[in-house]
UniProtKB/Swiss-Prot annotation:
Source organism superkingdom: Eukaryota
Name of the molecule in the record: Ependymin-2
InterPro entries: Ependymin, Ependymin_CS
PROSITE patterns with a match to the protein in the record: EPENDYMIN_1, EPENDYMIN_2
This protein's UniProt keywords: Calcium, Glycoprotein, Secreted, Signal
Family: Belongs to the ependymin family.
Protein's organism: Oncorhynchus mykiss
GO biological process: cell-matrix adhesion
Tissue: EPDs are synthesized in the meninx and secreted in the cerebrospinal fluid.
Modified how: Binds calcium through the terminal sialic acids.
Function noted in UniProt: May play a role in neural plasticity. May be involved during axon regeneration.
Residues modified by glycosylation: 33, 73, 97
UniProt-listed Pfam families: Ependymin
Length: 221
């Protein structure tokens, strides 16, 4: 855990942290509704796994991610996921071929919401020594996800609890999730409505020994 913590902190400190602030141990916070761009990078090799627009309903725990057409270094369809965390299912949607897969989600944890049990580590400023109005006050949180046996370090803004970046690692994967162009509202709530061709799709059986979760889904794209 110490090696993981050092690696995660090093990443963000290198991004421009200029002054540590006194930490008062803030309570676990909840993300607002959001629309933005999510980029997923595999730190081993620096491969961009996916980048695209998302909508997140923080009240009903629904996430829609649609991969950008600019991410063309792949042979399969662009990823389009609707994740219903409260229901424990997600849909892999292919709008081009009007096909859909419905599968189980085995964990509620994801990169756009602090997982339960996240422990506050430090409060700091990111920005410039000379241009104070450009500084962003942020919190760093760390923890583990029991269902996935993974560890994470998350960077959120103070106040709104906007997730800026999440570093996630297991024995087999190491991913960095970056959140940008964030607007604190769901601009298109219809994104959470299933396409008609998905409505009658049966839940697929999960292969023995396999666990579907937000992090693993993006690792396999």
């Amino acid at each position: 855990m110490q090696d993981f913590a050092f690696a995660a902190l090093s990443i963000w400190l290198c991004l421009g942290a200029t002054a540590l602030a006194e930490s008062h141990g803030p309570q676990h916070c909840t993300s607002p509704n959001m629309t933005g761009v999510l980029t997923v990078m595999a730190l081993t090799g620096g491969e961009i796994k996916a980048t695209g627009h998302y909508s997140y309903d923080s009240t009903n725990k629904k996430l829609r991610f649609t991969e950008s057409e600019m991410h063309l270094n792949k042979t399969e369809h662009l990823e389009d996921y609707l994740m219903l965390f409260e229901e424990g299912v997600f849909y892999d949607i292919d709008m081009k071929n009007q096909s859909c897969k419905k599968m189980s989600l085995h964990s509620h944890a994801h990169a756009l919401e602090l997982p339960a049990g996240a422990a506050h580590q430090v409060e700091l400023f990111l920005g410039s020594d000379t241009v104070q109005e450009d500084n962003i006050k942020v919190n760093i949180w760390m923890g583990s996800v029991a269902e996935t046996k993974g560890q994470y370090s998350a960077l959120t803004t103070v106040g709104e609890c906007l997730p800026l970046s999440t570093f996630y690692s297991t024995d087999s994967i190491t991913l960095l999730f970056s959140n940008s162009e964030v607007v604190t509202e769901v601009k298109a709530p219809e994104m959470f409505t299933l396409p008609s061709f998905c409505e009658a799709v049966e839940l697929e059986e999960t292969p023995k020994g396999q666990k579907n979760d937000f992090f693993n889904i993006f690792n396999t794209v």
